[in-house]
Amino acid sequence: MAAELRSLTVDIDTGRWRDTVLTEVDLRVRDGQVTVLLGGPGDGKTMVAYALTGRLPESARTTGEVLVEGRVGYVPQDGIDAFARDRSVGAQLRELASGNGTWTVERACAAAHYPSEALDLLPQHNSAGQIQRAAVAAALLTDPDMLIADSPTASLDQGTAFGVWKSIREYADAGAAVLVITHDLLLLTATGYADQLVIMSKGQVVTAGSMNDLKTSDDSRVRRYFQG
């Protein structure tokens, strides 16, 4: 088991306002599998990623348990957040690669479909799609036991998105645990790469299961993802 949340509740208390963003969340991310979080804006998906990667804000108060085994790689929702703005993407990727012997920059870029001709560009001079792919490459270079990707294909055309999903699936098949946050159920259905879907609503896990299992659910919060 690469990671598990046990009855995790997260309250954000800034002193001016307080909000419960996660309530009694139970979640398992298994080795060798792709687990996908589905939900609307504000339903708590990114907060789950923050909990698993140690990125919860200082104002967060938690109860429950967060259990993580091994190294965790993270692909942020906005890929440019994975990079400093004052150095080229290539320089930063090479720095990451220098501490790890498993992945080379060339291999990581190929897996993420990041074009080699963009390596010399500053992050902000990449297109939205390019910098998102670069962020995937950066995460792979850390050789994580668990990869967490927050909307990794949101800025990509369909062909490139398929390629990134294929890379994610291959990484899981090599033994890693993968957690992906996405809104693109059509692409998810087309690839068939998800082993488990976890649907969230208002900070809670509604249900979890395979794509086929959830398609037959009677819960309206689940059915809406499979209608139309």
Which residue ranges define each predicted feature?
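Q-loop/switch helix immediately C-terminal to the Walker
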Residues: D78, R85-G101
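Hydrophobic anchor residue at the start of the ABC signature
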Residues: V136
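Catalytic Walker B motif of ABC-type/P-loop ATPase nucleotide-binding domains
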Residues: L147-S151
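Conserved catalytic motifs of ABC-family nucleotide-binding domains
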Residues: D143
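C-terminal boundary and immediately downstream tail of ABC-type ATPase nucleotide-binding domains
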Residues: I199, M211-G228
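Conserved ABC ATPase signature
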Residues: L122-N126, Q130
